[in-house]
Design a protein with these regions (language model features):
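Amphipathic alpha-helical assembly/interaction segments
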Residues: 1-148
């Protein structure tokens, strides 16, 4: 992980992206569009998956990244359950559900593996890396008192 500088480079993020894209295609299908509350919930959960991954990574510390990965994995779980409901009320076919479930399982497994790695890593994250040169001090803005 030491060489990863962008959250989009993680295999876990890529798997989540594939899964949420398929969920997006699913919720645009005609039978499902009629169930607006379900569509809204699935859209929010899909957005949450990718957003929490990115937000956690950008916070720079492994502890925070791990916490946001947990939120991300929770949203994957939510999205894994909602197609079950869709099958039960005959909005989607069992085969489509099984394909989605496999994608969700892959994403959750990769998120879990990344979380375990971060928890056992002796590195604290980008936030705590010592820089070879000091960070330059910010310049103070000059006061413009007396100017009209």
């Amino acid at each position: 992980m030491a060489n990863i500088t962008d959250f989009r480079d993680f295999q876990a993020f890529k798997a989540c992206r594939v899964f949420t894209r398929e969920i997006g295609l699913l919720i645009r299908s005609v039978p499902l569009r009629r169930n607006r509350s379900l569509v809204d919930q699935m859209e929010r959960a899909s957005i949450s998956v990718l957003s929490n991954f990115a937000e956690g990574f950008e916070r720079d510390g492994n502890a925070e990244f791990t916490r946001f990965l947990s939120f991300c994995k929770g949203s994957v779980g939510e999205l894994r359950a909602q197609p079950i409901y869709c099958v039960d009320i005959e909005l989607i076919e069992q085969e489509r559900y099984e394909a989605l479930d496999l994608m969700a399982e892959t994403a959750a497994r990769l998120l879990g593996g990344l979380t375990r790695y971060l928890k056992t890593s002796n590195k604290a994250g980008r936030k705590y890396v010592r820089r070879s040169q000091p960070i330059p001090k910010r310049r103070r803005r000059m006061s413009v008192k007396g100017r009209a």
